[in-house]
Regions:
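Active-site mouth loops of central-metabolism enzymes
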Residues: 58-68, 141-154, 236-250, 312-319
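A substrate-binding/cap region within the structured catalytic cores of diverse enzymes
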Residues: 144-169, 176-192, 196-197, 204, ...
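Preference for extracellular/luminal or secreted protein segments
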Residues: 22-74, 78, 318-563
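Bacterial N-terminal signal peptides that target proteins for export
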Residues: 1-9
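Bacterial N-terminal signal peptides
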Residues: 9-18
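Short acidic, glycine-rich surface-loop motifs adjacent to enzyme active sites
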Residues: 75-94, 173, 183-184, 258-280, ...
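Second-shell residues forming the walls of enzyme active-site clefts
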Residues: 50, 93-113, 127-129, 195-365, ...
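Structural recognition of the beta-strand scaffold that forms the well-ordered cores
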Residues: 57-62, 82-88, 116-121, 125-127, ...
Length: 563
């Protein structure tokens, strides 16, 4: 009996000691980089933060020019802005991007708690490439869908991420896992992996894994799914008229794949589902979508980030940026993006800071979001694979473009090329007297250059990528007249306007080869052409692959990833 009592007493003392020592005492002068368990350090940091700092931590701002404005820099070092976004208008000079990131991170480290910035961009690959300069122009998601290999998704993301990581960018708003359901979707199109939800989910999960391996945080978008609308949420609030069962079995499927793989971030979309929520509120501002569905039903525990709140899809419903911000936080977002210059965000700041001071519930919601952001920052920045806080512009030539990546992107482009119609021009072996007309967009010089590497007897007919109806009509009549003097016409089709020009070659009795780039939808009914090749992007690798396939250098084995 005495022995049992002694064991019981020892057990009780052990439990008490375990409880006491499990609560780490963090000194008052600790900061973000102090060596303590992440969960406890996150609690400590949030407890030390003022309302100003808490609110700032859940904001992500962009800047208007090539370099951050003095006002944005002040937001970082005076208020503790938590995140910044690199947009396409900031990025023609990658060295300037790197130095801008370093400047902003240095300001973040001058504050007492030394919490670094999340630095994000949209580098999806293919059509969407916000960081330009010397970065790789890649085949893109639909090309990955056409090749069908998850390993292509993995390495596409891996090499894209290595390039932007060299610039100090630590978060990428990719992959896009919207199903290409509505074939008239102008905003998604080739950004999608395809129409099959399971397929999209598998490729999205592989893309995410490649990003993580390279040291960049991936972000799946646009929850709960942007693929079944022809409207663009930049200018409108799209309404998607499906019920919850359809949503669950189609739109949500790719997100389920990614949640199972512990995707660290998901972007909420400005999309209305009136059959699910009758008041028309966008998913990005909806507690039903973000808390009830994403958090509770799907079990997602990572960061939720809004799409840009300056898009009409958000502000049209909320009525003002300030109210949209409040609704976004109350719905369950952790980071709110506003792309405008910092001065436009002052009203957002003032009204929501006042609300924090008057509403305990709202303050607690902000605290919860700020804690989640800080916890993810602790786990990311203290890993051995984080992007540099202070990227060195002098070393970028060695890293951008990624040399290994260039080889991969060409091979991946070749795997993606789809012979939608083979015809008598595949392979194309013209005799020395054959007259060839190359018809393509002025903005795609690689189309003409790759053709002339293989076929010397070529003439050029150029038109603009973007044309009004009158210009397209004039070009259509002009190409009919010009094409009569040639035996074969090879035309690049990138949109409905260029497809209209191609249609005017239909009854001339000439051999016509259509090379489709971006979405293949405009050429799907052009069966009158002799040969149709699908390439899915206008990258130089894609044009090299398209002409390689046409020339018989390899077989075009890609498959159209649309239902």
């Amino acid at each position: 009996m005495m022995k049992k009592k002694l064991v019981l007493v020892c057990t009780i003392f052990a439990l008490i000691a375990s409880f006491c020592f499990s609560q780490t005492k963090i000194p008052e002068d600790a900061d973000f980089w102090s060596d303590y368990p992440a969960e406890e350090l996150a609690d400590f940091l949030v407890g030390k933060m003022s309302n100003d700092e808490l609110l700032s931590q859940i904001l992500m701002f962009g800047w208007a020019g090539a370099e951050p404005s003095e006002l944005l820099i002040k937001w970082v070092y005076e208020r503790g802005l938590g995140s910044v976004k690199v947009f396409g208008w900031n990025t023609d000079n990658t060295q300037l991007v790197a130095s801008s990131v370093a400047t902003l991170q240095k300001k973040s480290q001058s504050r007492k708690l030394r919490i670094p910035l999340f630095v994000a961009t949209d580098q999806e690959g293919g059509w969407i490439r916000h960081v330009k300069g010397e970065t790789s122009e890649t085949p893109g998601n639909m090309a990955i869908g056409a090749s069908g290999y998850p390993i292509d998704a993995y390495y596409s993301s891996y090499y894209i991420s290595r390039e932007i990581k060299a610039l100090g960018i630590n978060m990428n708003f990719a992959p896009t896992v919207d199903n290409y359901t509505n074939l008239q979707s102008s905003v998604i199109g080739p950004r999608s992996f395809g129409s099959n939800p399971d397929f999209v989910g598998q490729l999205g999960a592989s893309f995410s894994a490649g990003s993580i391996a390279a040291g960049v945080i991936p972000t799946a978008k646009h929850f709960p799914g942007h693929g079944d609308t022809s409207l663009d949420s930049h200018g409108n609030l799209p309404q998607i008229d499906i019920d919850y069962k359809t949503l669950e079995n189609r739109e949500l499927v790719p997100f389920k794949f990614l949640i199972a793989e512990k995707i660290p971030a998901i972007m909420s979309g400005h999309l209305s589902f009136p059959k699910i929520i009758s008041n028309g509120e966008p998913a990005s501002l909806s507690k039903v979508f973000l808390t009830d569905i994403l958090r509770n039903r799907l079990g997602y525990e990572g960061l939720i980030i809004t799409d840009d709140m300056m898009m009409n899809g958000a502000t049209m419903y909320a009525g003002s940026l300030s109210r949209a911000f409040r609704l976004a936080i109350e719905a369950g977002n952790d980071i709110v993006i506003s792309s405008t210059t910092a001065r436009w965000n002052e009203s957002l700041w003032t009204s929501n800071l006042a609300l924090m001071e008057s509403s305990t519930a709202f303050k607690q919601t902000v605290q919860k979001a700020a804690r989640r952001v800080i916890l993810y920052k602790l786990n990311y920045f203290k890993s051995n694979n984080a992007a540099p806080l202070y990227p060195d512009p002098a070393t970028l030539d060695q890293k951008i473009p990624d040399r290994e990546g260039q080889k991969f992107f060409l091979s991946q482009a070749c795997r993606s090329i789809t012979a939608y119609k083979t015809g008598k021009c595949l392979p194309f072996a013209p005799d020395e007297n054959e007259r060839i007309l190359l018809a393509g967009q002025t903005q795609f010089p690689d189309f003409f250059e790759e053709a002339k590497k293989r076929y010397s007897n070529c003439a050029e007919f150029k038109f603009d990528y973007e044309m009004g109806p009158n210009q397209a009509d004039w070009m259509s009549r002009n190409i009919q007249t010009t094409a009569k003097n040639y035996d074969t016409i090879i035309i690049c089709v990138a949109n409905e306007r260029s497809a209209m020009i191609a249609e005017h070659l239909k009854n001339l009795g000439k051999k016509v080869v259509i090379m489709s780039v971006l979405s293949p939808v405009p050429v799907l009914n052009c069966k009158w052409a002799d040969t149709i090749l699908l390439g899915y992007s206008y990258s130089p690798y894609t044009f090299e692959a398209l002409f390689g396939a046409l020339n018989g250098e390899f077989e075009a084995d890609g498959e159209l990833p649309l239902n």
